Amino acid sequence: MELLHYTGISIVKNAPVEKNSAFKVLNRISHTRETFFKTPFEVINIPKPNNSAYTAHALRNHMDLPWFENPPGYQFLHCLINSAKGWNSSAIDAFAVADYLRKNEEKIFDILVNTPLKFRDKDYTQEAVRSFYGSAISLTKDGDYNDIRYSIATLDALDCHPDKMDSVYKALHRFGNLLHDAKFQINFRLEPCDIFSFNNRRLLHGRTEFDPNSGHRHLQGYYMDRDEIIGRLNYLKKIKP
């Protein structure tokens, strides 16, 4: 749990492989967060998907639910089956990318911190349109990194002054390229019994495409608020200093 909190990523090995069994692991931390996807949500290839995750297509590195005012702090993807060719996972520490820009490309960094972006989702299964404005990089009062809000698939039309449009586009393009740069990204393959655990507002995740005729891939996903992880860590430190 400390690894997850301080680095933004961990992979639990040798978890149970039965459906819904990740509850046994996660409930040792705290309760999960419910969303309209339900809990757990099934990451499988389906005929009429309401989200690109439910296809065999590749996904660019992204965070989940950026159109929420308060996106889930942590996500857990429990691998039940992964026998298909392809569909390898990727992860990138967006805080490290932001820090690179802060130190080397300050103008782009400032644009990403100070420009509200609109993220939008239209879900036919819920008969709902959700949207929220937030900057790609947000900082704490002390200037540390608080959140990354980025998903090119759900980024709506830019809503900024025409004079700033070109510079904002260029900043987003640069940020998007770095969020797929090999020097920041790791690639791996999830195996059955793995729980890929990560900070949804720091670590962006993606995957390669797969051939649905070559086998199956089934993940179950869970969310948890950041407060639950931090609260449990604070408690454990208090009783076990």
Spans of features found by a protein language model:
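Active-site environment of non-heme Fe oxygenases that use a 2-His-1-carboxylate facial triad
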Residues: M1-P241
